[in-house]
Amino acid sequence: MEGKVPAYKVNMVFFSVYGVLGCLFPFLTYYFQRQGISYAEMGVAFALVSLTSAVAQPIWGYLADKYSNKRKILIIALAGCVLSVYSLMLAGGFWLVSMSIILVMTFLSPLVPVTDAYCFALNRHYGGFEYGRFRLMGSLGFALVALLTGWAVRQWGMEVAWYLYSAMSLYAMVLILSIDFTDANPGITVRHTDMKRLFTNPKVMLLLGAVLLTHIAVGSNGSYIALLMEATGGDVAHIGLLWFIVAISELPFLFYGAHLVRFFGELNLFVIGLAAFVLRYLLNSVCTSYVAVVAIQLMQGFTAMFVLMAALEYLNRMAPGRLRTVAMTVHAAAVALGGMIGNLGGGVLLEYVTIFVLYQILAVVCAAALVLVYVLKKIDKTKRPRYAA
């Protein structure tokens, strides 16, 4: 089709957006430790990361759908990312760090869900844009940038991470400015009755409940796995390597993501991912070497990616077209709220239990999410076609 957006540009958008995340999230625990923040304060700081995301994401998503312009929302958010990160460099002490976290996350939090929704909009308009292939580039961006940032932080200090974050945000903004697609839908408006119908649907609420529980565990793991690495002999460069392994392990599952969803069905894929999460966290709880911790993260592909693809595809199917960005950002808000609970609860628990006991608790939380998905499977009557190889 004439004027079709080149796939390589969308690939690079995903690469750069997830690269922005790779400059920040793997190193927040290290940053907080260097600021002299206690475990309990660290839990509060991580909870602010999630709480800010949970509040900001639906607002950004609503604006993107209301004005039918995901591209403009991404440009505004990325411009905020370019500048806001320097507040972390200047902050000192728990309260200033906390305010900086709120500022940074206000602009960072919409990037992934709105980019996801933008990709789905491109696919509906042009066809041939498979989400899993683009998300693969996101994982690659996160992996390479996290690895580079870990090495750079060890060489030159934490400040270099903020410069890289700002540069990646600027690069992503330039890429999106070069894409001439605004997903405008004249005559389509967001109606509050549609929102009420969607979010009172018991299937949607069960799915979001399972996402919430899963990300209580995922959020706690993401924040405190650096402590597990230190407890088993690792350092900051090994943390960068760990997140590189996490992201690289996602690639084959994202490449074949659409086939896996069609073959298993969304909810069956969700069940497999959650069962693997239970095993993954139990294995983490008995590690005695950072090498083993890194090796276990190879399970990321069929844990987190199965859960992510299953949830997004199910929501995209259940939501009416005018509410798909809202649905994506509410999913992201459930992820963020779960992360907030996991971060805050994990920080408090670590005042009383070891990091190894915390991982046993995370396995139990994932088992509870598995129960919710099993109930959802029982009430979901939609037949999903099996993929013919």
Regions found by a protein language model. Give the residues of each.
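C-terminal ends and interior cores of transmembrane alpha-helices
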Residues: 79-92, 275-288
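A membrane-interface helix-boundary motif in multi-pass transporters
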Residues: 151-168, 348-366
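Juxtamembrane intracellular "pre-TM" segments in multi-pass secondary transporters
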Residues: 1-4, 179-211
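Helix-loop boundary and gating motifs at the non-cytosolic
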Residues: 2-50, 204-242
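Helix-to-loop junctions at the C-terminal end of transmembrane segments
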Residues: 55-69, 153, 252-265, 350-351
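Cytoplasmic membrane-interface "Motif A"-like loop-to-helix N-cap segments
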Residues: 66-78, 262-274
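Cytoplasmic helix-loop-helix junction between adjacent transmembrane helices
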Residues: 104-137
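Loop-to-transmembrane helix entry/capping segments in MFS-fold secondary transporters
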Residues: 39-40, 125-137, 236-237, 319-331
